[in-house]
């Protein structure tokens, strides 16, 4: 297969590839030897985080093709406990840079099963305790199905590694006194975005983690009045738009653009206190 301008690649066997450019051949073996690990493509400086009553740590803003930044993710600190929002590639590298050990993690909130939000689950499986796996049943089902296929394990074995905590879609759920609301978000695979809220010594605090989302323009072009045609209704579009523009104290947005990510201009009139 030609990649670009005379550079060809072919797959020889599992994780073994041969590149050809003007008669020069290079073989690349991506298989790992025992105890060998893939290196992270980006360096991260070390940070000292505080274990606050309620805090949000920005731990990534890239996508699955980004060689310079960790994938879109956040870390919630609540009452001193550590919760991840998604577990992407090189999650251990990110945690080490923040001074967080895998064995310190209380739970992980899952948005969806795309690799850049999912690939780090195998790292969490090796913790010395069952980390709480927090998601709606629909998201959990897609993740378990994919993980079982990739890791060659039975689907029922998922509960051997994680403590499953199901969330009710579109409702406020109590997770160890932290209120969490998963909201369905249009995306190529089943996806929920999250609202978090609590009350601390200052007052009510809220955080919105919106990854992954779709742009209003893409959704608008899908509107149809014909129920027999693929697409969405005007009512559905209005509902999604209203939820995307929910007012919170801090909102972290996926604005990667294109057909499957959000657009920054959609939030130019967002009523939230701070957008990231």
How should these model regions be labeled?
Residues 102, 150-154, 226-227:
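Short, hinge-like loop/turn segments at secondary-structure boundaries
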Residues 113-119, 141-142, 171, 188-190, ...:
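Active-site environment of divalent metal-dependent phosphoester hydrolases
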Residues 170, 259-276:
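Binuclear metal-ion centers of metallo-dependent hydrolases, dominated by the metallo-beta-lactamase
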Residues 136, 210-211, 253-257:
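Structural motif
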Residues 1-100, 166-247:
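Core dinuclear metal-dependent hydrolase active-site scaffold
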Residues 89-138, 241-252:
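Active-site metal-binding motif and surrounding structural segment of the metallo-beta-lactamase
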Residues 139-166:
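Active-site neighborhood of divalent metal-dependent phosphoester bond hydrolases
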